[in-house]
């Protein structure tokens, strides 16, 4: 059965309210607008409603019959922090983010999870206007990187010398072992930005649409050798692959709701929904193949399914009601291509062979 809601929350509510009387209907699947989702959130229906994309974080806790097949923005942010800390063991993390709207909310979720994991980022920098000039923020992050460079004691090199006992019979000059640099060659933290700093292990930079050109071209100037973690707005492949950006962000990771093939073509929403539909149909079929036909059985199997791995997505329900997808795709950018490293659910990281 196929119904057209016309994008109306009222129509969606009317249609869904009428379906429980049809014994042939076991579940409802469809891409709904936010208005339609909110209209159905308070409806107590015996039919599970499967929604391809996520809505507001926390809605799954309030609506038991809504099943979100994609991880929420909060889950994506949490998985990003968990990947850095739990899987990669990073402790020195810096953050650069826009200070309002959805990006600010995403960054707040990330910072909250970092704190839950016992990590306090070494630098958190915000910007409000169009990021045409981020020199202040990036200089502050670079200063934080300098502050992590271990201090060298003046006598360290001399105290670590090993002198053979036979040499002690003669006059020994330290210049016999090494040449001291001239005074004007000694480097300190006031040096030029040409010095590469590796003390910040990871940087989290979620950008808004149309910000890649600004941030992607400024970041390399500050010579921070780190693992960059971005978001889906970095994946404008035509821009990302340009010489002024791509070579400087090799190894960038993006925690996403879909695989690399789908993320790399994220400008084509029709292709995205078509690929998601194939995966979600396969997910439903995997439950039906267990011999589940009745509504109650289907609902129980839905909440307790052990995990599904499709071509473009993975599904493992978490949360109070076991109705929000907790699996995320881990993507890596390198050599002008995007590949999927694996699937991460916060507890285990399943590597792929892509």
Predicted regions located by residue number:
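Extracytosolic ligand-binding ectodomains
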Residues: 1-354
């Amino acid at each position: 059965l196929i119904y057209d809601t016309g994008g109306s929350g009222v129509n969606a509510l009317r249609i869904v309210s009428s379906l429980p009387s049809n014994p042939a209907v076991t579940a409802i699947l469809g891409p709904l607008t936010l208005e339609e989702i909110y209209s159905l959130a308070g409806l107590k229906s015996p039919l599970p409603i499967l929604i391809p994309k996520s809505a507001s974080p926390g809605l799954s806790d309030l609506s038991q019959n809504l099943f979100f097949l994609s991880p929420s923005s909060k889950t994506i942010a949490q998985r990003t922090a968990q990947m850095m800390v739990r899987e990669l063991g990073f402790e020195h993390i810096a953050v650069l983010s826009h200070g309002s709207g959805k990006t600010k909310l995403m960054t707040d979720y990330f910072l909250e999870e970092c704190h839950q994991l016992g990590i306090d980022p070494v630098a958190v920098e915000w910007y409000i206007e169009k990021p045409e000039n981020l020199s202040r923020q990036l200089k502050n992050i670079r200063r934080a990187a300098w502050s992590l460079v271990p201090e060298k004691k003046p006598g360290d090199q001399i105290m670590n010398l090993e002198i053979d006992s036979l040499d002690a019979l003669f006059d020994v000059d330290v210049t016999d072992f090494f040449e001291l640099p001239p005074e004007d060659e000694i480097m300190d933290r006031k040096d030029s930005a040409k010095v590469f700093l590796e003390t910040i292990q990871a940087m989290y930079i979620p950008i808004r649409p149309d910000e890649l050109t600004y941030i992607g071209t400024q970041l390399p100037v500050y010579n921070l050798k780190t693992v960059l973690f971005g978001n889906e707005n970095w994946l404008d492949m035509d821009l990302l692959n340009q010489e002024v950006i791509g070579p400087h962000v090799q190894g960038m990771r993006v925690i996403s709701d879909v695989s690399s093939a789908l993320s790399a073509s994220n400008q084509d929403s029709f292709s995205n929904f078509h690929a998601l539909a194939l995966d979600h149909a396969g997910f439903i079929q995997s439950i039906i193949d267990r011999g589940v036909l009745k509504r109650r059985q289907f609902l129980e199997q839905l909440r307790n399914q052990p995990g599904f791995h499709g071509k473009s997505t993975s599904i493992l329900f978490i949360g109070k009601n076991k109705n929000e997808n907790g699996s995320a795709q881990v993507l890596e950018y390198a050599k002008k291509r995007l590949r999927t490293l694996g699937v991460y659910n916060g507890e285990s990281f399943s590597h792929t062979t892509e």
